[in-house]
Amino acid sequence: MTIEALRTPDEAFTAVPDFDYPVHYADDLPGYEGLRAAWIDAGPADADRVFLCLHGEPSWSFLYRRMIPVFLESGARVVAPDLFGFGRSDKPVRQQDYSFDFHRNHLLRLVERLDLRNITLVVQDWGGLLGLTLPVDAGFAGRLSRLIVMNTGIGQGESPGAGFDAWKNYALSTPDLPVGRIIARGTPHLTEQEIAAYDAP
């Protein structure tokens, strides 16, 4: 099945500050053939440990720009994927293509592709909703060593709640979501250049 998607041009990322890390792409992850997945992969490929950094909504891997150097200084490898719909990854056009399983399975396929082991899973916001469920997958469980959990939770299978519904309604009613300004509300020390970087995708 082909999924129609949009792609942010590379030129949109030329002015992104403090984020000069190797970007990798794959358009052949099993189950996602034709969709381009993007991720940052920095540090030694043969490092004995890896930090896997999962961003939330509505950000992208740029969120980790200040943490990546700290992780790299420890001698570790750092992998920070952009979920589909965010950052440098393709953005499926149809709303129904976005589901929990769609995002979760993308992460599992990427971990398998890169054969990541001794993982410190770093999760924030929606990255936690997705990432904290990865260890129940038999193929992932033996790869995980540590967790860093920030500003997130894990669902209980009940209704999403008023806060989620309010966010969803806001996002659906806003034709051009001001991502940089949304992030800046909770992070008032951001520069205008950093705010623009959140808007880049």
Question: How would you name each of these model-derived features?
Answer:
Residues C53-G56, A80:
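Structural cue for short, hydrophobic secondary-structure segments
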Residues T2-V23, A37-A45, V50, L63, ...:
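Flexible "cap/lid" subdomain of the alpha/beta-hydrolase fold that forms the substrate-access gate
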Residues E57-I68:
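The serine-hydrolase catalytic nucleophile loop
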Residues G31-G34:
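Per-ARNT-Sim (PAS) sensory domains and their PAS-associated C-terminal
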Residues A26:
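Short phosphate-coordinating micro-motif centered on Lys-Gly-acidic
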